[in-house]
Amino acid sequence: MYFYLKYNINNMIMRRVRSFVSRNRKLTQNKRQFLKNYLLKYGIDFSCSYVNFNFIFNNEYPVILEIGFGTGEFLINMARKNLFSNFLGIEVYIPSILSCLRYIHKYNLPNVKVIFYDAVEVISYMISNNSLSEVYILFPDPWPKRRHHKRRIITKELLEVILKKLVFGGYLNIATDCQIYAKSILNIIENIKGYINLSNTGDYVIRSDYRLVTKFEKKGLVLGNKIFNLKFKSIFNNSNFL
């Protein structure tokens, strides 16, 4: 299992500009042991080969991905409510991994797996085309300063890759409290053939009742921040990319 990110796998050149800054600190012995034990049970190692979800989850249920799950609130809530769906969470921060693993263990959820690695590389190298029913990216770092925009995780390249990973009719859900970021995402999506914006007004949708309002989101709402919810449907024919 990986405790620290490794950027060169099998001599492959990994991307240089990343959407995160490592804040992982030294762990206590107990936390290191917990992480080791439960990543073995609930984690998937990074590799440059596609994951067989039917084998990993021992069923053929739909797979839902959350990129950057934070404390794991949303991921766990969805997994508990949807036992006939499988959930994959990708995260790079150890505190987030620890929090989510505790939830998975507490509720004994067989339908959740986590990957401790860079989401862009996981999606590119580990997830086969036409294998995801839904993708969530909730409150990604907006990197508000112009000189940092290149660090944003949501790029045209990522959205094009996600489109190939989604099944026909699959959904991409994004939420942010940064209007500039939201508009940027809309502009990017407009230039990608294969997505339909499900907003009646061509921009944002109302938050679905089944999407848990996380602690992070609640704090923003208390401060008066507006939340921008985006939802897109894949109409891309993946048959040529299987």
Swiss-Prot record:
Its EC number is 2.1.1.33. Keywords: Methyltransferase, S-adenosyl-L-methionine, Transferase, tRNA processing. The active site is at 141. Pfam families: Methyltransf_4. GO terms for molecular function: tRNA (guanine(46)-N7)-methyltransferase activity. Pathway: tRNA modification; N(7)-methylguanine-tRNA biosynthesis. S-adenosyl-L-methionine binds at residues 66, 91, 118, 141. One of its GO terms (cellular component) is tRNA methyltransferase complex. It comes from the Bacteria. The keyword Transmembrane helix does not apply. Disulfide bonds: none annotated. It is an enzyme of class 2 (transferase). It catalyses: guanosine(46) in tRNA + S-adenosyl-L-methionine = N(7)-methylguanosine(46) in tRNA + S-adenosyl-L-homocysteine. Substrate binds at residues 145, 177, 214-217. Transmembrane segments: none annotated. InterPro entries: SAM-dependent_MTases_sf (IPR029063), tRNA_(Gua-N-7)_MeTrfase_Trmb (IPR003358), tRNA_methyltr_TrmB_bact (IPR055361). Monomer. Belongs to the class I-like SAM-binding methyltransferase superfamily. TrmB family. Catalyzes the formation of N(7)-methylguanine at position 46 (m7G46) in tRNA. This is tRNA (guanine-N(7)-)-methyltransferase. The lineage of its organism: Bacteria, Pseudomonadati, Pseudomonadota, Gammaproteobacteria, Enterobacterales.
